[in-house]
């Protein structure tokens, strides 16, 4: 009998072990331990013939991470599969042992969180699915507390605190030292690490990071909470042991100590085993798999399945054609997790002490705790993406080294051994492709791993045979063609006992010799097939060295029969050996050598071990670098990025590197050729090439399929590179030659220009002045793996990089490079000007600093360009510590024959360039001190005398001009900007022309003849208009004054509106702008400036002070309803001034800071309330919408702002950009006719009426003109009621304003989800399309649900919802229309969709966005002009109607201000903070809430978020906030309901 019981017990244990969690290798001792620990428990039940009772603490609550992990808050298919698996296990036990097995699931969620609905739904699921072998228990069942038998949620939740308190009072051990247990008990440590990862990955969605929650404090809080959870978990374990003393103890976690049977709840090939932390998907073959929901969502081969109206799981779609199905080779989430050895995972961090018998290992964690999450074969438990903290002696994730069957941890692998291993295991894998031009096309020569490894060995033997093996590692200098020999030589040197030293050919001879001397380099290698560059020849003349001739590349690659050249060092032996040598750029002096040790390079390998960064969800920069990805780098091999991207990253990440073509400098044409000829996944580019790519859209579009571009080596232009980022993600990296890339994280796409760094990097940003921080690094415990710079400087504890950064205004962990702390910070900013190649501030020891600018095109110095550059300089001045440190007269330009000295990465060498321009700078300052004009007698009597005087003036700076002809180009003779400045200074003084002549006149007229002619012309004009000659020429002066008065009177003539103006009915366009006020500034000062600035704007644009009136019925061609603008005549202009109204509401409304903190909530105050609150100004503006559209309003505000700045002392604020014809409402009709767009009405497609807010005349509705639709014709005008009046009477029940926020992260998620949706058919909708589609669908769904669910309305299948989008037609109308034209140029882009389709769960946002994109494509110049023709033909304006008028319908209008450039509106910084730029600008919505359905998308927030505002009834709002799709992306921030 005893043997029978033992046999049955073994069978039962075997069945349970088939369901075991095996995330560590099943070591024999562990299996023996399982039998030893658990067989006696099972045998007791079997001997008694009773049912085996097991308990499993599990199923606490659904993860809070609904962005990436799970589908919702309630159990779904994942839980169902887990319960079924447990139930099936019990059923199988019953087959061999009839009493069977029952599992009691003890919901431990209450130990850590208040949960009820999840547990109740789980019980209902078990009952519905008849999982009869599973029972449930809650924590209250473990405690002796009187409660009702049938307990409600209210009673249960009300007693949560009591439950926890009783648990701790009864079972907490006073002598528990939790830190000691973590250090000594492997099970406790496993659970602790799991808790930390769970907390760090999930709590950020409950308690988002912000200004008052730093990365450090967040991590610290999570560690504290994890320990508290362990303490409660220990008490919970003791309670279970007490309540279930004889039960078989199951656990969802690995148990190193073997005290629990570890169970895998999900039987999938991935490592995701806890259903409350993942989602499941069913493949086409019926197999179930598990992974984070976010991974499934990205795979367009999967579709989301709903059950009972809630998302349940994913399902593989039917395969189409030859499309690949989902398999391990085509889906990254299916890569099997690699089992870790428990000893490797924990052993190195645990001292040799026995497991404490008193510590009951908690198993109530809500996440798996076994190891770090890794992609690919090194993954263990990828339920979170945060590997535990570890030190050099701690956790080491391992990679297989198949060459010696040893496991080598990431961060401790040696580059030569990685390649030898690859050649042995995957000899045919292509590791390099060598590009060559064949005619105009590229050809590629593939290099396999075997061929490459053989070539390395051949090169190593060649070197060894030439010079033998040195006693210690010696440098080998090399400058050669940009081909694969750089890579081969690097590897070969390491194997042969040397280290390659790559010198830049741009070094000076002095600099190169300094590096060679510092490294004691006595061995030089030249490529045998090319002549050495001049630098090498000069160096070899001054420093005798042993010179070798490196064979040609083809010879080295022909290495089939080469014997292996072994490299057998261990990492600990090689850690401090130099892998190669580079050197500093020499920007501030002679370059210095930098050895790259194997330890330093190991930090690049260890990046994959980093947990998520400062914001939790920001991944390390190498996250998306996948095996087999193709990379191309434009960096030279003498630059650190060239070594990293061509040698290190391909080896460490198994990349396929494209190299060459040799002899071709990377340029935009080569990028174009590469993009066309092969697929490049990862581009690594110098900053200048990234910028050029942004200005070359034809090439940029060809890179769209690539993953991203790594930009490094210096700052990129935020404008040009920003254009690149819109097409292909720009990964903006920063690093140092001494430390490589340390801690770079990937910020959200919209923040691509900013840097974010991982806490392990040890970076500190010390504030040195407001908005300026100095970059430091401090050694920490993670330095061996993540702080490479301390491998280079092992003696240092802290290092000042001397780089300056600016902090993101709303995201405190994001930083932007500002400059060097030992340079003036203005240089970095000024260089962002698109026309500037580089600049240097000079003048140390001088009373006034100067600026030397190197232009990209030194011959283009137009007046507009110079003004534009000066604006940038002024902005730089405002950012600097000292105001106005650069003056316009102290800006000079580099000469074409003396380009700035630069490093390989394109950075300006300051000292070398200043030395090059030393004489120039001295002449520059002399030219500012000399005053030739006071003594020069300029004869203006004739053209000849003017030319003679010009020649003499120029000769002071340009002696050769004396002998040149009058038509010789002065710049060809050598005239530079100093000479230009000196000449202009003299001419101004000698001729009396003053500022009427400037440097631009010389640049535009660069010969003596042309310059003399322009001087004569300017002098004549000055003479006729001079105010100083009133007595001498009274007639001419009166004439000029009369001309000015005529112009002013013309500008005040009343005018009628044109046909386009009536697209907007006669009503006000209300806008509200929010400005912070500087400390110490009074409301009266601000008001006076605004009032005076507005009056000055009325002088500039008199029509703004006018009044809209009805046209006279006696007028020729009068049509009823015609309107005109009447403007006060000049004599009564003062009557229209002082329009602003002063209100001090500081005692009524909250302060500006409070309003800002509340997001300027609409409910905080009425639209009618303005304008002063404590600390700020609320400026309410009302413009007539019939006379101006949105862009016209923008022009008006910009002019007002500039006039306010002028009154504050900004003499450049002259509104010179404003075209005088901007308010000429006759222009559209003139251009329409003169450009030939007018045509007969019968030729116009009747579908054009669909773009207008007017119904066709009655006779046309019954007798349409264009009966026959042709291919490509417009869709029919959508049908909606004609409203008899405008405006409609106000509804009795008005809508209430509600505001939602889509955060930057949610906006990116929305965009990603839409782009990934197959409904887009490969077309990428714009962000405006996506936001509008999202908003339209959500608003109509809410109304539809109210109508159908509450009002019980029914809709026919053909009932449609119409979306009206006011659309600016300026880009389509005429290039001759002034860009600042202010009149209305709008049409209505209408899109319609059946209501049931729009609101259906089967309709995606992507489908709606694609429809909007297709609708926008219908707008063409022909359509716009046809619309204008129809508007001109209207007999009146009484048939005005839009679909959104009224409240009881299913239509909407969206006013999309998303891309409204509020930053262009700057009211000055004398009184306003923030430069007078409004913090936000919004339309006044209250006025329309009773008359039409109006949705508004506010301008993009500074943090990249989007605010959506609409009017709702309360029941509609309730539907919105319960819409899972809508609330996935948007959250309500304010409502007036």
Swiss-Prot record:
Name used for this protein in its record: Isocyanide synthase-NRPS hybrid crmA
Pfam families given in the database record: AMP-binding, AMP-binding_C_3, DIT1_PvcA, PP-binding
InterPro entries: ACP-like_sf, AMP-binding_CS, AMP-dep_synth/lig_dom, ANL_N_sf, CAT-like_dom_sf, Isocyanide_synthase_DIT1, PP-bd_ACP
Function, in words: Isocyanide synthase-NRPS hybrid; part of the crm gene cluster that mediates the biosynthesis of a yet unidentified copper-responsive metabolite. Converts valine into valine isocyanide that then contributes to two distinct biosynthetic pathways under copper-limiting conditions. Reaction of valine isocyanide with the imine intermediate of festuclavine results in formation of the amide bond in fumivaline A. In addition, valine isocyanide contributes to biosynthesis of a family of acylated sugar alcohols, the D-mannitol-derived fumicicolins.
Reported induction: Expressed in copper depleted conditions via the regulation of the macA transcription factor.
Entry's EC annotation: 1.-.-.-, 6.3.2.-
Chain positions covered by the region annotation Isocyanide synthase domain: 1-502
GO molecular function: isomerase activity; ligase activity; oxidoreductase activity
Deletion consequences: Does not affect the xanthocillin production. Abolishes the production of fumivalines and fumicicolins.
Keyword Ligase: yes
Keyword terms of this UniProt record: Isomerase, Ligase, Oxidoreductase, Phosphopantetheine, Phosphoprotein
Boundaries of every Carrier domain copy: 941-1019
Region (Transferase) residue spans: 1293-1526
Residue stretches of biased makeup (Polar residues): 382-391
Modified residues (O-(pantetheine 4'-phosphoryl)serine): 977
Biased composition (Low complexity): 352-381
Biological source species: Aspergillus fumigatus (strain ATCC MYA-4609 / CBS 101355 / FGSC A1100 / Af293) (Neosartorya fumigata)
Region (Disordered), start-end ranges: 351-391
Pathway given in the UniProt record: Secondary metabolite biosynthesis
């Amino acid at each position: 009998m005893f043997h029978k019981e033992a046999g049955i017990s073994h069978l039962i244990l075997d069945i349970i072990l088939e369901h075991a969690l095996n995330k560590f290798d099943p070591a024999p001792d562990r299996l023996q331990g399982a039998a030893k620990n658990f067989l006696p428990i099972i045998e007791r039940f079997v001997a008694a013939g009773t049912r085996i009772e097991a308990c499993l603490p599990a199923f606490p609550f659904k993860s809070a991470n609904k962005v990436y992990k799970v589908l919702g808050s309630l159990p779904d298919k994942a839980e169902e599969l887990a319960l079924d698996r447990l139930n099936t296990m019990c059923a199988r036990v019953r087959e061999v042992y009839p009493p069977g097995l029952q599992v009691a699931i003890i919901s431990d969620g209450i130990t850590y969180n208040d949960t009820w609905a999840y547990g109740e739904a789980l019980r209902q699921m078990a009952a519905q699915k008849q999982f009869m072998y599973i029972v449930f228990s809650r924590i209250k069942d473990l405690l002796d507390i009187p409660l009702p038998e049938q307990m409600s949620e209210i009673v249960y939740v009300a007693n949560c605190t009591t439950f926890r308190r009783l648990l701790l009072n009864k079972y907490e051990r006073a002598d528990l030292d939790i830190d000691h247990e973590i250090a000594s008990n492997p099970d406790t440590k496993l659970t602790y690490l799991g808790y930390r990862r769970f907390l760090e990955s999930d709590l950020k969605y409950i308690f988002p990071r912000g200004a008052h929650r730093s990365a450090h404090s967040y991590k610290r809080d999570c560690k504290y909470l994890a320990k508290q959870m362990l303490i409660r978990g220990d008490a919970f374990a003791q309670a279970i042991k007490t309540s279930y003393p004889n039960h078989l103890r199951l656990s969802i976690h690995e148990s190193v100590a073997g005290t629990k049977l570890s169970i895998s709840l999900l039987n999938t090939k991935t490592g995701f085993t806890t259903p409350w932390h993942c989602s499941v998907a069913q493949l086409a073959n019926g197999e179930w798999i598990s992974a984070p929901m976010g991974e499934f969502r990205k795979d367009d081969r999967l579709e989301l399945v709903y059950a009972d109206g809630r998302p349940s799981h994913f399902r593989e779609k039917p395969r189409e054609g030859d499309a690949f199905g989902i398999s391990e080779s085509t889906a990254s989430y299916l890569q099997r997790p690699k089992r870790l050895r428990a000893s490797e995972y924990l052993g190195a961090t645990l001292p040799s002490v026995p497991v404490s018998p008193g510590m009951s290992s908690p198993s109530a964690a809500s996440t798996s705790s076994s190891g770090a999450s890794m992609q690919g074969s090194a993954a263990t438990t990828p339920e979170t993406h945060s590997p535990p903290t570890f030190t050099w002696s701690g956790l080491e994730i391992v990679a297989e080294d198949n060459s010696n069957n040893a496991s080598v941890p990431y961060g401790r692998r040696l580059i030569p051994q990685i390649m030898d291993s690859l050649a042995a295991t995957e000899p045919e894998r292509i590791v390099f492709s060598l590009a060559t031009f064949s005619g105009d096309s590229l050809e590629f020569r593939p290099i396999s791993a075997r061929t490459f490894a053989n070539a390395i060995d051949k090169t190593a033997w060649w070197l060894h045979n030439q010079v033998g093996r040195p006693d210690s590692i010696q440098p080998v200098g090399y400058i050669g063609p940009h081909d694969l020999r750089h890579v081969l030589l690097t590897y070969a040197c390491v194997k042969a006992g040397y280290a390659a030293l790559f010198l830049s050919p741009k070094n000076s001879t002095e600099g190169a010799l300094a590096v060679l001397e510092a490294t004691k380099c006595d061995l030089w290698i030249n490529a045998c097939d090319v002549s050495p560059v001049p630098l090498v020849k000069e160096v070899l003349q001054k420093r005798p060295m042993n010179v070798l001739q490196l064979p040609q590349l083809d010879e080295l690659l022909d290495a089939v029969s080469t014997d292996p050249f072994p490299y057998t060092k261990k990492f600990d032996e090689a850690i401090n050996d130099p892998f190669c040598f580079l050197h500093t750029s020499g920007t501030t002096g002679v370059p210095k050598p930098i050895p790259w040790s194997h330890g330093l390079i190991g930090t690049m390998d260890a990046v994959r071990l980093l947990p998520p960064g400062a914001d939790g969800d920001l991944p390390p920069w190498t996250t998306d670098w996948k095996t087999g990805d193709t990379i191309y780098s434009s960096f030279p091999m003498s630059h650190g990025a060239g070594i990293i991207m061509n040698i290190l990253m391909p080896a460490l990440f198994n990349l396929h590197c494209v190299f060459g073509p040799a002899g071709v400098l990377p340029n935009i044409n080569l990028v174009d050729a590469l993009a066309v000829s092969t697929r490049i996944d990862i581009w690594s580019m110098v900053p200048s090439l990234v910028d050029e790519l942004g200005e070359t859209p034809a090439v940029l579009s060809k890179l769209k399929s690539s993953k991203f571009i790594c930009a490094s080596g210096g700052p990129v232009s935020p404008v040009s590179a920003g254009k690149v980022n819109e097409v292909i993600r720009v990964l903006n990296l920063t690093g140092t030659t001494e430390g490589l890339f340390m801690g770079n994280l990937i910020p959200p796409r919209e923040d691509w220009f900013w840097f974010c760094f991982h806490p392990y990097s040890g970076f500190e940003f010390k504030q040195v002045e407001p908005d300026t921080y100095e970059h430091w690094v401090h050694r920490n415990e993670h330095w061996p793996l993540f702080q490479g710079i301390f491998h280079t400087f092992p003696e240092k504890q802290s290092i000042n990089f001397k780089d300056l950064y600016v902090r993101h205004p709303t995201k405190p962990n994001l930083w932007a490079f500002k400059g060097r702390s030992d340079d003036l910070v203005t240089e970095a900013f000024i260089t962002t000007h698109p026309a500037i190649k580089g600049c240097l501030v000079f003048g140390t020891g001088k009373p006034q600093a100067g600026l030397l600018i190197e232009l990209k095109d030194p011959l283009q110095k137009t007046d507009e360009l110079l003004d534009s550059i000066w604006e940038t300089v002024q902005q730089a001045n405002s950012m600097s510590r000292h105001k106005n440190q650069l003056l316009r007269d102290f800006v000079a330009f580099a000469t074409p024959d003396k380009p700035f000295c630069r490093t390989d990465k394109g950075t300006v060498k300051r000292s070398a360039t200043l030395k090059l321009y030393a004489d120039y700078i001295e002449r520059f300052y002399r030219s500012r001190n000399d005053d030739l004009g006071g003594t020069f007698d300029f004869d203006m009597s004739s053209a000849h005398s003017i030319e003679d005087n010009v020649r003499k003036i120029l000769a002071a700076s340009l002696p050769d001009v004396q002998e040149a002809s009058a038509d010789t180009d002065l710049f060809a003779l050598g005239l530079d900007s100093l000479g230009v400045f000196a000449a202009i200074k003299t001419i101004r003084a000698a001729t009396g022309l003053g500022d009427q002549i400037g440097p631009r006149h010389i640049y535009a007229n660069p010969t003596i003849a042309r310059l003399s002619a322009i001087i004569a012309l300017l002098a004549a004009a000055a003479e006729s208009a001079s105010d100083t000659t009133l007595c001498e020429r009274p007639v001419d002066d009166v004439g000029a004054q009369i001309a000015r008065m005529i112009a002013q009177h013309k500008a005040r003539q009343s005018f009628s509106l044109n046909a386009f103006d009536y697209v907007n009915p006669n009503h006000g366009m209300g806008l509200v702008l929010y400005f912070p006020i500087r400390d110490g500034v009074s409301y009266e000062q601000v008001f006076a400036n605004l009032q005076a600035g507005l009056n000055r704007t009325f002088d500039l644009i008199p029509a703004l002070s006018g009044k809209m009136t009805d046209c006279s019925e006696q007028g020729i061609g009068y049509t009823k309803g015609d309107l005109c603008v009447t403007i006060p005549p000049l004599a009564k202009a003062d009557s229209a001034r002082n329009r602003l109204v002063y209100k001090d509401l500081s005692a009524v409304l909250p302060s500006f800071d409070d309003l800002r903190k509340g997001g300027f909530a609409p409910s905080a105050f009425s639209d009618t309330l303005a304008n002063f609150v404590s600390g700020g100004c609320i400026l309410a503006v009302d413009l007539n919408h019939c006379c101006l559209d949105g862009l016209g309003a923008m022009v008006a505000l910009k002019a007002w702002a500039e006039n306010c700045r002028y009154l504050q002392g900004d003499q450049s604020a002259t509104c010179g950009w404003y075209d005088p014809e901007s308010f000429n409402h006759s222009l559209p009709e003139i251009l329409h006719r003169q450009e030939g767009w007018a045509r007969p009405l019968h030729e116009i497609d009747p579908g054009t009426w669909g773009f207008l807010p007017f119904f066709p005349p009655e006779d046309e509705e019954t007798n349409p003109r264009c009966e026959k639709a042709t291919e490509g014709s417009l869709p029919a005008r959508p049908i909606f009621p004609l409203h008899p009046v405008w405006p409609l009477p106000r509804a009795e029940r008005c809508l209430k304003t509600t505001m939602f926020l889509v955060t930057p992260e949610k906006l990116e998620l929305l965009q990603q989800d839409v782009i990934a949706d197959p409904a887009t058919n490969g077309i990428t909708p714009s962000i405006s399309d996506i936001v509008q589609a999202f908003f339209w669908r959500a608003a109509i769904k809410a109304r539809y649900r109210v109508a159908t669910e509450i009002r019980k309305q029914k809709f026919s299948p053909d009932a449609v919802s119409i979306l009206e989008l006011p659309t600016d037609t300026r880009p389509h109308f005429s290039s001759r229309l002034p860009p600042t034209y202010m009149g209305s140029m709008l049409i209505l882009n209408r899109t319609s969709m059946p209501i049931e389709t729009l609101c259906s769960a089967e309709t995606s946002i992507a489908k709606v966005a694609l429809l909007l994109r297709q609708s926008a494509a219908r707008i063409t110049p022909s359509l716009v002009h046809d619309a204008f023709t129809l508007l001109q033909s209207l007999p009146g304006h009484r048939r005005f109607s839009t679909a959104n008028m009224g409240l009881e319908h299913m239509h909407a209008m969206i006013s999309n201000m998303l891309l409204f450039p509020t930053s262009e509106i700057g009211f000055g910084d004398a009184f306003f903070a923030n430069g007078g730029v409004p913090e936000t600008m919004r339309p006044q919505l209250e006025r329309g809430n009773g008359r039409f359905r109006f949705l508004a998308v506010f301008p993009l927030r500074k943090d990249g978020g989007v605010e959506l505002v609409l009017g709702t009834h309360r029941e509609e709002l309730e539907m919105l906030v319960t819409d899972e799709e809508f609330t996935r992306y948007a959250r309500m921030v304010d409502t007036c309901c």
